[in-house]
A protein has these predicted regions:
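Long protein-protein interaction modules used by eukaryotic assembly/scaffold proteins
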Residues: 1-61, 67, 80-229
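Eukaryotic beta-rich interaction modules
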Residues: 68-75
Length: 229
């Protein structure tokens, strides 16, 4: 970690490196998965422990199987993020009894790079076929930010995810979850990973949530859900 600059103004011009930005986004995904599992009651509240992150009290799963699954995802996700291979990450909540997808959290990733990437195709690994990442969003959003400003944006997004319980239907019965990672078609994929359909919500409602950006990435959030019968 770089030592703090003696002049206050130095913090204003600090730019997060591409590698540092990729690590920050991957870490955000990790906490997002845990937060969704807790807030949506996919696992019992007693299966979570509190940690301090982004200036917030975050809850992370202490279930060994869940931790192992997320760790496996993150180890690969870190590598793909470092090489700019990810266009989105999706958390899908599924009814165990019916197999119906009832909730879908989508995190779209834009990489602010000048290298030509627009022609690359993507596939959802550990799940899905990809829509092209729309890199046309204004790069103006990438004005230099301090890490503190980025952390504040992330904290605001997590507060919104937490507040989503006010409009999302209560999940009925036992549910499970899957994580889909949309990676470039030329990405190296571990043998235990496989392609998947997009696991969209049939006739679902959609709500656009907040996003955040660094000088290298922008992440936008969308939740889709099935209305109760």
């Amino acid at each position: 970690m770089a030592s703090a600059a003696p002049e206050k103004d130095k913090s204003k011009v600090h730019k997060l490196s591409l590698k540092g930005s990729a690590k920050l986004v991957a870490e955000f995904f990790q906490y997002s998965i845990h937060t969704i599992l807790f807030q949506r009651g996919v696992y019992p509240a007693e299966d979570f422990t509190a940690v301090k992150k982004y200036g917030l009290n975050m809850l992370v799963s202490s279930d060994d199987q869940v931790k192992a699954y997320i760790k496996k995802i993150m180890s690969q996700l870190d590598r793909w993020m470092q090489h700019g291979k990810i266009s989105k990450l999706v958390v899908v909540v599924t009814d165990k009894d019916t197999g119906e997808h009832v909730e879908r959290w989508q995190f779209d990733v834009q990489i602010f790079q000048t290298k030509s990437k627009s022609s690359k195709s993507s596939k959802a690994k550990s799940a899905a076929t990809n829509q092209e990442n729309d890199a046309s969003a204004a790069h103006a959003a990438t004005a230099d930010k301090t890490e503190a400003e980025i952390q504040a944006e992330i904290a605001a997004l997590f507060r919104q995810i937490t507040a989503s319980v006010t409009f999302l239907p209560q999940l009925q019965g036992d549910c499970t979850f899957n994580v889909l990672v949309y990676a470039d078609a030329d990405s190296e994929v571990p043998v235990e990973w496989g392609d998947s359909d997009a696991k969209e919500i049939v006739n679902g409602e959609r709500v656009q949530l907040r996003g955040f950006s660094t000088t290298s990435h922008r992440v936008d959030t969308l939740v889709s859900y099935r209305l109760g019968d």
